[in-house]
């Protein structure tokens, strides 16, 4: 089982994981609100491979655009900023999963910057099979 992880440098209780309890229906609405397009997504919240955010081909947006729109919308919703630190693609059971490692920053109410890392999982099978 692949799990996302969140490494905090001292203040775990103050930093929420990027996706937290956001469900796919709410995620679609967040992306529409913050990015201005109706992303063709389904699945889970991306915290594990088993709950990966499924990005469907819509013939308009490439997967990177959709991934960044999702991450941007989630960050704005949680008042976080993030950077992509790395990523990988794995094929498991005929499906393709992209993991994106994020560096996350949050300024707490006292003005201190809290930092951590989290991996978000995307199912990009439709894009990989149609290459």
Question: Model segments located where?
Answer:
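Short amphipathic alpha-helical surface micro-motifs
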Residues: 35-36, 80-81, 101-105
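N-terminal trafficking/processing presequences and adjacent post-cleavage segments
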Residues: 1-72
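Short, compact, well-ordered microdomains
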Residues: 85-131
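Generic intrinsically disordered, low-complexity segments enriched for polar/acidic and small residues
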Residues: 2-8, 34, 79, 94, ...
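Short secondary-structure junctions
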Residues: 73-83
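Exposed, flexible binding/inhibitory loops of compact, secreted disulfide-stabilized domains
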Residues: 61, 81-82, 90
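Amphipathic alpha-helical interaction segments
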Residues: 13, 80, 129-130
């Amino acid at each position: 089982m692949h799990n996302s992880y969140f490494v905090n440098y001292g203040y775990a209780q103050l930093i929420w994981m990027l996706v937290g309890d956001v469900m796919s229906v709410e995620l679609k609405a967040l992306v529409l609100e913050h990015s201005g397009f109706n992303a063709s997504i389904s699945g889970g919240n991306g915290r594990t491979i088993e709950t990966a955010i499924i990005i469907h081909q819509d013939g308009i947006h490439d997967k990177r655009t959709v991934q960044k729109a999702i991450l941007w919308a989630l960050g704005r919703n949680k008042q976080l900023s993030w950077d992509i630190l790395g990523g990988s693609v794995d094929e498991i059971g005929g499906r393709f999963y992209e993991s994106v490692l994020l560096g996350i920053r949050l300024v707490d109410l006292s003005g201190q910057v809290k930092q951590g890392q989290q991996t978000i999982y995307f199912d990009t099978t439709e894009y990989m099979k149609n290459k």
